[in-house]
Amino acid sequence: MRITVETTVAAPIDQVWRAYTTPADIVKWNAASDDWHTTKATVDLREGGTFSSRMEAKDGSMGFDFAGTYTRIVEHKRIEYAFGDRKAEVEFVPGPNGVVVRVAFDGEATHSVEQQRGGWQAILDNF
């Protein structure tokens, strides 16, 4: 099953791209709610390069790593990556109100489509 989320960021494409691909920026926005945060992020932004984000509950009760491998990069336009046996694509589309950031990803069987869409959308909305 394919799930898509998107948001519009009122900034120029170069700033949006940098914020999406720079570890120092990722730790600022990559959280689904105020009680979670990203404590560390790594990015090797090239095809075959890897990325990871350590996401933790602020109370220390739980955490997990989100990691994958970049499979295609078109600067300022598109990022494709694999994470486990799933894939995702991120599109950056400049428009009159800013840049639309659209993420399409393969869902997983553990959580409902609504839960997955809601979680990914909440993270993207922080961007």
Predicted regions and their residues:
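Hydrophobic ligand-binding cavity/cleft-lining segments
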Residues: 1-35
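Intrinsic-disorder/low-complexity, polar/charged segments enriched in Ser/Thr/Lys/Arg/Asp/Glu/Gln
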Residues: 2-6, 13, 38, 50, ...
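Generic structural detector for well-ordered beta-strands
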Residues: 4-10, 44, 54, 69, ...
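Solvent-exposed residues in well-ordered beta-strands and their adjoining turns
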Residues: 8-12, 56, 73, 93, ...
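Generic alpha-helical structural signal
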Residues: 10, 67, 121-125
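Hydrophobic pocket/interface hotspot
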Residues: 16, 26, 51-53, 70, ...
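Glycine-rich portal/gate segments that line the openings of hydrophobic small-molecule binding cavities
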Residues: 37-81
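Beta-strand/loop substructures that line and gate deep hydrophobic ligand-binding cavities in soluble
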Residues: 77-122, 127
